[in-house]
Amino acid sequence: MAAKWEKLEGNVGVLTIEVDAKEVNKSLDAAFKKVVKTINVPGFRKGKMPRPLFEQRFGVESLYQDALDIILPKAYSEAIDETGIFPVAHPEIDIEKFEKNENLVFTAKVTVKPEVKLGEYKGLAVEKIDTTVTDEDVENELKALQERQAELVVKEDGTVENGDTAVIDFEGFVNGEAFEGGKGENYSLAIGSGTFIPGFEEQLIGLKAGESKDVEVTFPEEYHAEELAGKPATFKVTVHEIKAKELPELNDEFAKDVNEEVATLDELKAKLRTDLEEGKKHEAEHKVRDEVVEKAAANAEIDIPEAMIETELDRMVREFEQRLSQQGMNLELYYQFTGTDADKLKEQMKEDAQKRVRINLVLEAIIKAENIEVAEEEVNAEIEKMAEMYNMPVDAIKQALGSAEALAEDLKVRKAVDFLVDNSKAA
């Protein structure tokens, strides 16, 4: 087999591939063995018709498509290996010559991975992030814990206030007509939570249990149900019950209730401070890593093929579909609820897909430029770390991974980002 690669404009080129006649005849033999099993000919058992008689009756050309299906994938794959190109989309195949006892000649128009011209990626200026934890930060975290431990207690007297939970019946009308999904009974609505459309919750403030009110609102222009978007509506609301938050007292007992590792309120505050410090440090590290990667990607010159963006979009949609399934939803339901469709979803994701592809290509180029390698020991150490994290045997992790090659590539990327961070400077 012989293969020649000719680069055309942009990221497109043509592979010209010639396959020896011997391989062509082998593919025709294999095609005949496959096809003859499906033919009923009087005087012969199924699959036993002689080849010469078959060709005389049906013509050798009747085997060509099956033979091509056999020979093309192998020849194309070998041509890719021989020329060292990296296709990113299915090729456009054009058969120039295919006959029995003759060499096969075909071309494949191929879109390949683009060349990356790296810009500045060493010495990138990154913003220094303050990771100081103040007393106010600790107090706010303590208050949040206190809020989460609060109990809802029925208010026998009084009116709805911000922060209360009102148990209500409601029914919505647009132009005097009730609409689907606009009715609820004994619904617990936290006032000030922003659960309902803007303006709804505020109009319940001041009502007593047993009172009713017509709440006038306008659906937002971007509301997911297109038939309601931007339209004024009236909700008939009845308040059945009002519940107020009763906060627990901040003392040693509270501290022990929320964290079994501490015995006093002071110990809880110290633990909160440590956790906040670790969280801020972790967040700062992530921001720095994201910043250097984004700057290195922005500084590079790349002509990204649309095929790579489409492939990434398909991957992102699959990831999104998996997340939906974990919430008991599927894409069709999501499209109904949001008034969107597959094309609109992809359009929303396209910018992120372009960003992902650009970053991946740039990191790959940096790995090559800096000769970043990963030793087998590093891969094994990472597998052991994963086994400890998931509380699984090392062999089970290896089996789940299948090949360690993908993990090694992930570690190279991590090293490339480490390199960018280590070689950055404070802005």
UniProtKB/Swiss-Prot annotation:
Major enzyme class: isomerase
Record note on domains: Consists of 3 domains; the N-terminus binds the ribosome, the middle domain has PPIase activity, while the C-terminus has intrinsic chaperone activity on its own.
Gene3D superfamilies in UniProt: 3.10.50.40, Trigger factor ribosome-binding domain, Trigger factor, C-terminal domain
Gene coding for it: tig
KW Protein biosynthesis (keyword) present: no
EC number: 5.2.1.8
Molecular function, one GO term: ribosome binding
Annotated keywords: Cell cycle, Cell division, Chaperone, Cytoplasm, Isomerase, Rotamase
Protein name listed in UniProt: Trigger factor
Cellular localisation: Cytoplasm
PROSITE patterns, per the entry: FKBP_PPIASE
Similarity field: Belongs to the FKBP-type PPIase family. Tig subfamily.
Function according to Swiss-Prot or TrEMBL: Involved in protein export. Acts as a chaperone by maintaining the newly synthesized protein in an open conformation. Functions as a peptidyl-prolyl cis-trans isomerase.
